[in-house]
C-alpha cells in the first residue's frame, strides 16, 4: 500500500493521532503527514503511506488555504482561545479599518512565529520553553500571503480566508492583525480547506476510514505531484536515469526547461520519479519506483 490519503482531521486530536489511527487501520508503520494541524484546528491533512513518505517534503512545500476566525480585544499566550488570557481591550474599530488591516498583510513579509510552536531553538521546541515559563526572541521568517479575503464580520469576531506559503502561522497572523488595529486579537477557529492539490471537497473524514475501504481513497504518488508537468524519456534514458546517471547528451533528452522539476515517465507510462534538467543535463532528483 503506497500513496497519499487526503484525510479530514477533526477538532480535538493531534495530527500525530491521525497518523496513529491510519497505522492501526493499515498495519503499516511507514506513515507520515505533510503539515501539522493543532488540536483546535480541523481540515485537510494529507497522510503519506509506504513509499508515499518519500514525497512528504515536496508536498509540504505547497501553498495552504485556511478559513480562520479571530476575536478582537483579547490576547492570549498561545495566540488562540485555548491559551491564558494576557490582556482584554475595548474594541473601537470600524469595518473599513478591519478590512484595511487584514488586506495590509497581502504579499511577501516576515513573520515572528509564536512561542507555542514546534520550532526548535538549540535543540529544544519552543512550546517546551513556553511551558517552562520562558520566552525567547524568535527570528522573523519570510512568508507569502497570496490572497486574503474577509468572509464575515460580527464584531468582535472576524472570519477570513487566506492562501499562504508553507510555514505561515495563522495564529501569528491573527495576532499581528490585532496589533495593527491596536486592540489585540486571538485566533478563535481554524480550518484548513486546501493543501496544494488536496481539497476539503475531496477529503475523507477520519472516522469513515476502515480496513475494507481505505484502498478506495489512496491517491497514487504521481497523481499527488500533479503540480509538476509530465516528461517522457526513452528506454535508453530510463536505464541511465534509474541508475543515477545525469544525461548530458541533448540528442537523448526530451525538450525540457532548465531548472524546472518534472514528473519523469518511461515510454510505457511508468512513473520513475521527479527529475530536473540543469546546464549539465537531466537527472532524477527523487527516485520513486
Swiss-Prot record:
Kindly indicate whether the keyword Isomerase belongs to this entry: yes
Q: Annotated Gene Ontology MF terms?
A: RNA binding; tRNA pseudouridine(55) synthase activity
Tell me the Gene Ontology biological-process terms attached to this UniProt entry. Answer: mRNA pseudouridine synthesis; tRNA pseudouridine synthesis
Q: Which Pfam families match?
A: TruB_C_2 (PF16198), TruB_N (PF01509)
Q: Which domain of life is it from?
A: Bacteria
Keywords on this record?
Isomerase, tRNA processing
E.C. numbers: 5.4.99.25
Q: Where is the active site?
A: 38
InterPro entries from the entry?
PsdUridine_synth_cat_dom_sf, PsdUridine_synth_N, tRNA_psdUridine_synth_TruB, TruB_C
| Family from the record | Belongs to the pseudouridine synthase TruB family. Type 1 subfamily.
Q: What HAMAP family does UniProt report for this protein, alphabetically?
A: TruB_bact (MF_01080)
Instruction: Tell me the PANTHER family matching this sequence.
Output: PSEUDOURIDYLATE SYNTHASE TRUB1, TRNA-PSEUDOURIDINE SYNTHASE
Q: What is this protein called?
A: tRNA pseudouridine synthase B
Write down the species: Clostridium novyi (strain NT)
**What is the primary gene name for this protein?**
truB
Amino acid at each position: 500500500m503506497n500513496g497519499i490519503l487526503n484525510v479530514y482531521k477533526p477538532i480535538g486530536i493531534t495530527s500525530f493521532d491521525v497518523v496513529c489511527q491510519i497505522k492501526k487501520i493499515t498495519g503499516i508503520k511507514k506513515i507520515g503527514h505533510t503539515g501539522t494541524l493543532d488540536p483546535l484546528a480541523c481540515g485537510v491533512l494529507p497522510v503519506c503511506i509506504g513509499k508515499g513518505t518519500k514525497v512528504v517534503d515536496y508536498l509540504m512545500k505547497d501553498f495552504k488555504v485556511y478559513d480562520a476566525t479571530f476575536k478582537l480585544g483579547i490576547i492570549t499566550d498561545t495566540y488562540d482561545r485555548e491559551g491564558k488570557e494576557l490582556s482584554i481591550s475595548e474594541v473601537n474599530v470600524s469595518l473599513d479599518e478591519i478590512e484595511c488591516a487584514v488586506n495590509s498583510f497581502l504579499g511577501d513579509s516576515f513573520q515572528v512565529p509564536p512561542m507555542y510552536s514546534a520550532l526548535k531553538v538549540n535543540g529544544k521546541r519552543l512550546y517546551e520553553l513556553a511551558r517552562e515559563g520562558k520566552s525567547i526572541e524568535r527570528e522573523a521568517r519570510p512568508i507569502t500571503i497570496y490572497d486574503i479575503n474577509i468572509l464575515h464580520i460580527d464584531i468582535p469576531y472576524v472570519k477570513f480566508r487566506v492562501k499562504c506559503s508553507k510555514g505561515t502561522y495563522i495564529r501569528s497572523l491573527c495576532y499581528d492583525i490585532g496589533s495593527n488595529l491596536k486592540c489585540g486579537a486571538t485566533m478563535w477557529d481554524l480550518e484548513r480547506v486546501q493543501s496544494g492539490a488536496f481539497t476539503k471537497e475531496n477529503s475523507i473524514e477520519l472516522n469513515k476510514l476502515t480496513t475494507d475501504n481505505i484502498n478506495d481513497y489512496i491517491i497514487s504518488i504521481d497523481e499527488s505531484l500533479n503540480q509538476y508537468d509530465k516528461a517522457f524519456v526513452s528506454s535508453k534514458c530510463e536505464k541511465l536515469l534509474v541508475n543515477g546517471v545525469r544525461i548530458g547528451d541533448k540528442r537523448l533528452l526530451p525538450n525540457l526547461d532548465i531548472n524546472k522539476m518534472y514528473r519523469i515517465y518511461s515510454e510505457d507510462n511508468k512513473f520513475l520519479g521527479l527529475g530536473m534538467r540543469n546546464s549539465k543535463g537531466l537527472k532524477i532528483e527523487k527516485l520513486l519506483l
